[in-house]
From Swiss-Prot:
The keyword DNA-binding applies. Keywords: DNA-binding, Plasmid. Contains conserved positively charged amino acids probably involved in the binding of the pre protein to the RSA site. GO terms for molecular function: DNA binding. This is Plasmid recombination enzyme. It comes from Lactiplantibacillus plantarum. It holds the Pfam family Mob_Pre. CDD domains: MobM_relaxase. The gene is preA.
C-alpha cells in the first residue's frame, strides 16, 4: 500500500514571487532538473482564476478580507503551502482522470476544514517524475484574523496527518499515513531530491553487488568440481578403513595441502601485521600529539623567561648603567652568538666567574 504525502511550508511576502514563478512555470530556466518542459502543458490549477500573480493577488485578498484595519506585518506568513502527493507506483496505477480526482479529493479535505475561498491556488504538476499538487492556503481563522501559528499549530498538523489519509481512503484511494515520528525532520525540496538520488545510487550499488555475488557463486560452483576431483582409490586387503592412492594423486593432495596451509598462514600473517601496523600508527599519532603539546608549552615558557631576562637587563641598564653578560643573553636567545677570536685564559676565567656569580657591580 502506498503512502499519502502531505508536507507544509510557510511563505512570506518575499517568497511569493519566486514560488509563483516556479508553480506557474512562468520562467523557461528551471533549477529543478526533474521538470520536463515538453509536458508542462499538462499542468493545471484546481482553483484556476483566483490567483494570477502570487504576491499581488494574495496580498490583495488578505487586505480585502482581514478583520483588522492594521497593516499586515512584513514578516507575517501569508500562505501555508501544502505539497500533496504519493509515490510513483501509486500514480502509475491511475489514469489522468483518477489522478485529478485524487488531488481534488485532497483539496476538498482542506476546503472543508480551512475554507474553500482561502485556497488561493492548487497547481498540479504533471511535468515532473511524480505528480504532485502545490496548494496555497491563506491562514484565516473564522474571525478573519491572519495567524499561521494558530491555524496550523502542532495539533492541527497531527490531525491532518491522521485524517487526510483516512479521508482519501474513504473516497476510494488505497493509501495510508506514514509512520509516526515526532523527531522526523521535514526536508526541503532540494534535500528530498538529493536523498532520493542517494537512494537510487544505493539501489544501483545493491544490484551491482548482487550481480557480483551471483557471478562469484557461479565461479565457485565451477571450481568446486575441479578442486574435489575424484581420486582413484581402493581399500587395502588388511584394513578396510585405509585406502591406497596413486603416487601422482598423493603428490597432488600434498601439494594442495601445503599450498592451502601457506595461503592461510600468509593471510593470517598479513592480518596480524596490518593490525600491528595500525596499532603502531595509532601510538605514533598519540605520541606526536603529546610532543606537539609539550613543544607548545615549552615555547610559551621560553617566551616568558625571555621576557623576564629582558626586563632585568633593561632595569640594570637604566638604574645602574650595566647590562647582563652577553653570554646570558645569547643563552636566552635574546642575542646572536658572537664570533670572536679564541679568548685568553684570563678572559675565560672572568666569563666563568660571570656565569657563576652574576655581573660585576
Amino acid at each position: 500500500m502506498s503512502f499519502a504525502v502531505a508536507r507544509m511550508t510557510k511563505l512570506k511576502a518575499d517568497n511569493l514571487v519566486g514560488i509563483g514563478n516556479h508553480d506557474q512555470r512562468k520562467t523557461t530556466n528551471h533549477s529543478n532538473e526533474d521538470i520536463d518542459v515538453s509536458r508542462s502543458h499538462l499542468n493545471y490549477d484546481l482553483v484556476a482564476g483566483r490567483t494570477d500573480n502570487f504576491k499581488t493577488d494574495i496580498e490583495a485578498y488578505i487586505n480585502e478580507n482581514k478583520a483588522s484595519k492594521r497593516a499586515v506585518r512584513k514578516d507575517a506568513v501569508l500562505v501555508n503551502e501544502w505539497i500533496i502527493t504519493s509515490d510513483k507506483d501509486f500514480f502509475e496505477q491511475l489514469d489522468e482522470a483518477e489522478t485529478r480526482k485524487y488531488f481534488e479529493t485532497a483539496k476538498q479535505y482542506f476546503a472543508d476544514n480551512y475554507g474553500d475561498e482561502n485556497i488561493r491556488y492548487a497547481v498540479v504538476h504533471m511535468d515532473e517524475k511524480t505528480p504532485h499538487m502545490h496548494m496555497g492556503i491563506v491562514p484565516f481563522d473564522d474571525d478573519k484574523k491572519l495567524s499561521a501559528k494558530r491555524i496550523f499549530n502542532r495539533e492541527a498538523l497531527q490531525h491532518i496527518q491522521e485524517e487526510l489519509p483516512q479521508y482519501l481512503k474513504e473516497n476510494g484511494f488505497d493509501v495510508q499515513r506514514g509512520n509516526k515520528n515526532k523527531e522526523r525532520k521535514n526536508l526541503s525540496v532540494p534535500e528530498y531530491k538529493a536523498m532520493r538520488e542517494e537512494l537510487k545510487k544505493i539501489e544501483t550499488e545493491k544490484q551491482e553487488t548482487q550481480a557480483k555475488l551471483a557471478d562469484t557463486k557461479k565461479q565457485l560452483d565451477e571450481i568446486k568440481p575441479r578442486d574435489t576431483k575424484k581420486i582413484a582409490s581402493k581399500p587395502t586387503l588388511m584394513n578396510k578403513n585405509k585406502v591406497t592412492v596413486d603416487k601422482s594423486d598423493l603428490a597432488d593432495l600434498e601439494q594442495r595441502a601445503v599450498t592451502s596451509d601457506a595461503y592461510n598462514f600468509e593471510k593470517i600473517h598479513l592480518e596480524v601485521g596490518n593490525h600491528s601496523l595500525r596499532n603502531d600508527l595509532s601510538e605514533a599519532k598519540g605520541r606526536n600529539y603529546e610532543l606537539r603539546k609539550e613543544n607548545e608549552r615549552l615555547q610559551k615558557l621560553v617566551g616568558t623567561l625571555q621576557g623576564i631576562i629582558r626586563n632585568v637587563d633593561e632595569f640594570l641598564h637604566k638604574k645602574l648603567g650595566i647590562n647582563l653578560p652577553e653570554k646570558w643573553l645569547e643563552r636566552a636567545g635574546l642575542k646572536e652568538p658572537s664570533k670572536k677570536a679564541p679568548e685568553s685564559s684570563q678572559e675565560l676565567d672572568r666569563h666563568k666567574s660571570d656565569e657563576l656569580g652574576g655581573p660585576h657591580l
